[in-house]
């Protein structure tokens, strides 16, 4: 009986450990140093072909000099693509950002060339 209990506990520990390896909680602090108000902020897993919803929300703005923390829960990897759009529709796109290692400061020189 004790051996079965030990086996059940070991299985439960392995199950919990594998679940933790599947999904993680991350965040990234994004600082706006562009000189313009950011009106849209998209963060998507780097494996996605589409941008996820605007994390600033319907009333949200990221004003010049301000920082926005973006919480990212339930993702398998800390690698994300990030796009910001300012009040003039200029875009700033960052590919494959490891949010577990880096925060992001967006500057005028980061503007997309298109």
Listing of model-derived features with the role each one plays in the protein:
Residues 1-9:
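Bacterial N-terminal signal peptides that target proteins for export
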Residues 17-18:
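N-terminal signal peptide c-region/cleavage motif recognized by signal peptidases
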Residues 21-25:
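Boundary at the C-terminal end of the N-terminal hydrophobic targeting segment
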Residues 30-35:
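Asparagine-centered strand-capping/turn motif at beta-strand->loop junctions
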Residues 36-40, 92:
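Short acidic/proline- and small/hydrophobic-mixed sequence motifs that coincide with surface turns
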Residues 51-76:
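Intrinsically disordered, low-complexity Pro/Gly/Ser/Thr-rich segments with frequent PxxP/GP/PP motifs
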Residues 77-87:
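A short, solvent-exposed beta-strand micro-motif common in secreted/extracellular proteins
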Residues 90-114:
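Extracellular beta-sheet/turn segments enriched in Thr/Pro/Gly and aliphatic residues
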């Amino acid at each position: 009986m004790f051996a079965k209990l030990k086996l059940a506990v070991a299985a439960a520990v392995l199950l919990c450990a594998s679940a933790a390896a599947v999904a993680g909680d991350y965040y990234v602090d994004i600082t706006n140093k562009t000189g313009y108000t950011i009106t849209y902020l998209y963060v998507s897993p780097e494996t996605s072909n589409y941008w996820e919803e605007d994390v600033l929300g319907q009333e949200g703005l990221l004003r010049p000099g301000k920082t926005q923390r973006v919480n990212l829960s339930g993702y398998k990897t800390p690698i994300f693509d990030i796009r910001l759009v300012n009040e003039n529709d200029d875009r700033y796109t960052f590919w494959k950002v490891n949010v577990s290692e880096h925060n992001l400061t967006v500057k005028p020189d980061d503007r997309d060339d298109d």
